């Protein structure tokens, strides 16, 4: 899956867009150069990547189904940002926000969990389809390597 991601980013067709990576000590983020990131035309992308960022993520073990907080290795974080870059380059980035699920707090208050659609697709959340690389597919493939 990682090879597919790199092949798509390195596509040498005549209308190739570029993805530039720079190192930052801030939160990792990927920005499109313009609105063509969302309309099928495609745009150049800029990734600002922090290799020391290690966010704690709610993760479910595929075998045991146990949910726990886990850090994210730097290579997974970079893959996540590169997937955003791939979407931006191809014009397939999604600006919408989606409703994930209704959550009830301990106090009985209910609220609707929302997430940018682009994040849900990039991560590969259950119920959000993506034929291409996702963070979760790369996680699964990388577990076979280590």
Residue ranges and their predicted role:
Residues 1-30:
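A metal-dependent hydrolase signature that marks the N-terminal structural subdomain at the beginning
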Residues 80-81:
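Conserved beta-strand->loop/alpha-helix structural units within folded catalytic cores of enzymes
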Residues 7-8, 65, 109-110:
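Polar/charged alpha-helical tracts
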Residues 19-76, 85-89:
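Active-site scaffold of zinc-dependent metalloenzymes
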Residues 72, 86-146:
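Active-site or metal-binding loop neighborhoods of secreted/extracellular toxin and effector enzymes
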Residues 4-8, 56, 99, 144:
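Acidic/proline-rich low-complexity IDRs
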């Amino acid at each position: 899956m990682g090879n597919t991601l790199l092949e798509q980013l390195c596509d040498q067709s005549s209308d190739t867009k570029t993805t530039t990576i720079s190192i930052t000590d801030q939160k990792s983020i990927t920005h499109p150069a313009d609105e063509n990131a969302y309309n099928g035309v495609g745009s150049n992308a800029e990734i600002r990547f922090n290799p020391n960022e290690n966010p704690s993520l709610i993760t479910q073990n595929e075998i045991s189904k146990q949910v726990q907080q886990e850090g994210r290795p730097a290579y997974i974080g970079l893959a996540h940002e590169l997937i955003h870059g791939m979407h931006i380059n191809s014009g397939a980035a999604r600006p919408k926000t989606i409703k994930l699920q209704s959550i009830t707090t301990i106090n009985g208050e209910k609220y609707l969990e929302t997430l940018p659609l682009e994040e849900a697709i990039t991560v590969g959340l259950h119920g959000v389809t993506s034929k291409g690389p996702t963070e979760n597919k790369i996680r699964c493939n990388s577990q076979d390597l280590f």
